[in-house]
């Protein structure tokens, strides 16, 4: 009995000496000034806050991915637009080149017609023709039958520079040769069909106005000028007589 009472007293004394209520001065001091527990608590709080905000991170990632997809689609759309614009620009450049070539061709045709008209006016003036006071009848042709080289009536560029009120002369095909048979005449008496040819070349070959007409002033020699020795060596019997030109005496 005594032994049990003594052990109980020692246990009671030991408990009272080494145990103390919370908040008393006998409590052991925290390690490192108690900062370890505070840092652990802060880490736990940060981890908890990060775990609670996981849905926000996912939403932000989804928004960034959607923005990248929109930018990628916009770049692809811009690339297609640039390619379409490049093709359209090349087509327009080709059309402009063709139009420019056609413009140069029309300018050459216009200059040729003006030169022919001036030459014709000079020839008519040299013959004393009163063509300025005459009346011209202009026959309007259909667009399908009108040639590309035919001048347009009333065009200011085709009119002579110093002559006012002068209409473009009518172009008439050259008369057929006397020896050639008529289209309806022949062994069979039927018309011959020919393959269609280029109207521009045919018109240029049939219209005598397109070929330049030479006059005496265009040859550049005088009437009393001596002929070359090659002409003299042929003899007078082989030379054609020219009554308007004075031939030099033969030795």
Curated annotation (Swiss-Prot):
<dbReference type="GO" id="GO:0043065">
    <property type="term" value="P:positive regulation of apoptotic process"/>
</dbReference>
<dbReference type="GO" id="GO:0003677">
    <property type="term" value="F:DNA binding"/>
</dbReference>
<feature type="region of interest" description="Disordered">
    <location>
        <begin position="50"/>
        <end position="72"/>
    </location>
</feature>
<dbReference type="GO" id="GO:0051726">
    <property type="term" value="P:regulation of cell cycle"/>
</dbReference>
<feature type="modified residue" description="Phosphoserine">
    <location>
        <position position="188"/>
    </location>
</feature>
<keyword id="KW-0804">Transcription</keyword>
<dbReference type="GO" id="GO:0045995">
    <property type="term" value="P:regulation of embryonic development"/>
</dbReference>
<feature type="region of interest" description="Disordered">
    <location>
        <begin position="228"/>
        <end position="251"/>
    </location>
</feature>
<feature type="modified residue" description="Phosphothreonine">
    <location>
        <position position="172"/>
    </location>
</feature>
<dbReference type="GO" id="GO:0006275">
    <property type="term" value="P:regulation of DNA replication"/>
</dbReference>
<feature type="modified residue" description="Phosphoserine">
    <location>
        <position position="180"/>
    </location>
</feature>
<dbReference type="GO" id="GO:0006310">
    <property type="term" value="P:DNA recombination"/>
</dbReference>
<feature type="modified residue" description="Phosphothreonine">
    <location>
        <position position="207"/>
    </location>
</feature>
<dbReference type="InterPro" id="IPR056513">
    <property type="entry name" value="INO80F"/>
</dbReference>
<keyword id="KW-0227">DNA damage</keyword>
<keyword id="KW-0832">Ubl conjugation</keyword>
<dbReference type="GO" id="GO:1904507">
    <property type="term" value="P:positive regulation of telomere maintenance in response to DNA damage"/>
</dbReference>
<dbReference type="GO" id="GO:0006915">
    <property type="term" value="P:apoptotic process"/>
</dbReference>
<dbReference type="GO" id="GO:0006281">
    <property type="term" value="P:DNA repair"/>
</dbReference>
<dbReference type="GO" id="GO:0097190">
    <property type="term" value="P:apoptotic signaling pathway"/>
</dbReference>
<keyword id="KW-0805">Transcription regulation</keyword>
<comment type="function">
    <text>Appears to promote apoptosis in a p53/TP53-independent manner.</text>
</comment>
<feature type="compositionally biased region" description="Pro residues">
    <location>
        <begin position="170"/>
        <end position="181"/>
    </location>
</feature>
<dbReference type="GO" id="GO:0019901">
    <property type="term" value="F:protein kinase binding"/>
</dbReference>
<dbReference type="GO" id="GO:0060382">
    <property type="term" value="P:regulation of DNA strand elongation"/>
</dbReference>
<feature type="modified residue" description="Phosphoserine">
    <location>
        <position position="247"/>
    </location>
</feature>
<dbReference type="Pfam" id="PF24245">
    <property type="entry name" value="INO80F"/>
</dbReference>
<comment type="function">
    <text>Putative regulatory component of the chromatin remodeling INO80 complex which is involved in transcriptional regulation, DNA replication and probably DNA repair.</text>
</comment>
<dbReference type="GO" id="GO:0005634">
    <property type="term" value="C:nucleus"/>
</dbReference>
<keyword id="KW-0233">DNA recombination</keyword>
<dbReference type="GO" id="GO:0006338">
    <property type="term" value="P:chromatin remodeling"/>
</dbReference>
<dbReference type="GO" id="GO:0005654">
    <property type="term" value="C:nucleoplasm"/>
</dbReference>
<dbReference type="GO" id="GO:0045739">
    <property type="term" value="P:positive regulation of DNA repair"/>
</dbReference>
<protein>
    <recommendedName>
        <fullName>TCF3 fusion partner homolog</fullName>
    </recommendedName>
</protein>
<feature type="cross-link" description="Glycyl lysine isopeptide (Lys-Gly) (interchain with G-Cter in SUMO2)">
    <location>
        <position position="214"/>
    </location>
</feature>
<keyword id="KW-0539">Nucleus</keyword>
<dbReference type="GO" id="GO:0045893">
    <property type="term" value="P:positive regulation of DNA-templated transcription"/>
</dbReference>
<dbReference type="GO" id="GO:0005737">
    <property type="term" value="C:cytoplasm"/>
</dbReference>
<feature type="region of interest" description="Disordered">
    <location>
        <begin position="142"/>
        <end position="213"/>
    </location>
</feature>
<feature type="modified residue" description="Phosphoserine">
    <location>
        <position position="167"/>
    </location>
</feature>
<dbReference type="GO" id="GO:0000723">
    <property type="term" value="P:telomere maintenance"/>
</dbReference>
<dbReference type="InterPro" id="IPR033555">
    <property type="entry name" value="TFPT"/>
</dbReference>
